[in-house]
Amino acid sequence: MEEEIINKYSLLKKFNVSRETYFDFESLISMIIKKNQEINIISKKTSKNDDIRTRHIIDSAQIIDFIDLNSNTTSDLGTGGGMPGIVVAIIIKNLKKKMKFNLYEKSYRKSLFLREVSKNLNLDTEIIQKDVFLSNKIQTGTIMARAFKPLPVILDLVSNNFKSYKNLIIFMGKSGEKILKETLKKWDLVFEKKKSITNKD
């Protein structure tokens, strides 16, 4: 049974992810499926076990090598159902690293869900039920953004509202190359691109 679960996460073999993490991921999937019957945690189109595992959990987990492990905090700009914030927090917990995750989420009901998940999985998170655009002078290590806002909007937010940070991780999607090309006309960025392991686009 254990090996069967671990094999479902074979795409993550080359990453810094412990075996214990996969069982926490399975618990997270169960909590998402249960809560998704009450509120829209994730799209109904991707709410089956395998879809959640690949399109949400593994997709979020693949950024772990870009997380600044020397920082005390990491921030997720609009975590929604906990992707990538909760997923990365699970990995960090099982790596025995001390790091707090500040997860911004405007929705009251999603915030309650995130607090419940954090409690059940013993995660070091602070669920901030607030529009991150209304916060300022934020200090953090890594900043994460997945399915949040367009790249130029995120860059403006980080530039205006963050006092300090180490690095910024943005999931770009299918039109990522085009958006990046347009953004570079206005922004002077030092960046590294990484091909997704869950999506050929």
Name these PLM-found stretches.
Residues 175-201:
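Active-site capping/gating segments
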Residues 155-168:
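A short glycine-rich, Lys/Arg-flanked "PGG" loop and its adjoining helix->strand segment in the class I
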Residues 61-141, 145:
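Conserved SAM/SAH cofactor-binding pocket of Class I
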Residues 80, 147-150, 174:
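Short glycine-rich anion-binding loops that position phosphate/pyrophosphate groups of nucleotides
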Residues 165-177:
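Conserved beta-strand signature within the Rossmann-like core of class I S-adenosyl-L-methionine
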